[in-house]
């Protein structure tokens, strides 16, 4: 019988094939992996399942997350992640194809968008028809000013 941390029956998990897992506060806290995480992920794979880490934190790229969890001992590659940055890139491709996006966000967010074929600018440009604001751990007053300038124009606004 498969049991959880509290010795309760967890056999129902054996038949699940896909686990969507949040990261910070669920499998780790900042840079410390929670006890039992590696065993849990290993058990998923032993049972023929797959796990995907999901996050609404747009400040890091998939590459950043892969490196972070690998440092903690978790074997994962880009196929193990779905981030809000990726979802935003897909949304922009679908709803604003070929348009230029002004982005107020981290360098990782900008890189993630560019890797997904989005033309991104970080300074006010007339060519930008979409303003995107992401969680920005690198925010400056200049970025806020530039974003305000862009929002004063006729642009689509996403956050």
Annotate each PLM feature.
Residues 1-23, 27-159:
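HAD-like aspartate-dependent phosphatase fold
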């Amino acid at each position: 019988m498969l049991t959880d941390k509290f010795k309760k029956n967890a056999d129902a998990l054996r038949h699940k094939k896909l686990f969507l897992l949040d990261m910070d506060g669920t499998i780790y806290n900042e840079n410390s992996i929670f006890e039992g995480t590696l065993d849990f992920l290993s058990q998923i794979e032993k049972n023929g399942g797959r796990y995907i880490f999901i996050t609404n934190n747009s400040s890091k790229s998939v590459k950043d997350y892969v490196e972070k969890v690998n440092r903690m001992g978790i074997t994962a590659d880009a196929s193990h992640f779905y981030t809000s940055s990726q979802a935003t890139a897909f949304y922009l491709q679908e709803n604003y194809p070929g348009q230029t996006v002004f982005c107020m966000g981290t360098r990782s967010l900008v890189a993630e968008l560019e890797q997904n074929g989005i033309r991104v600018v970080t300074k006010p440009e007339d060519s930008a028809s979409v303003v995107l604001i992401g969680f920005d751990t690198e925010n400056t007053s200049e970025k806020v000013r530039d974003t305000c300038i862009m929002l004063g124009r006729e642009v689509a606004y996403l956050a």
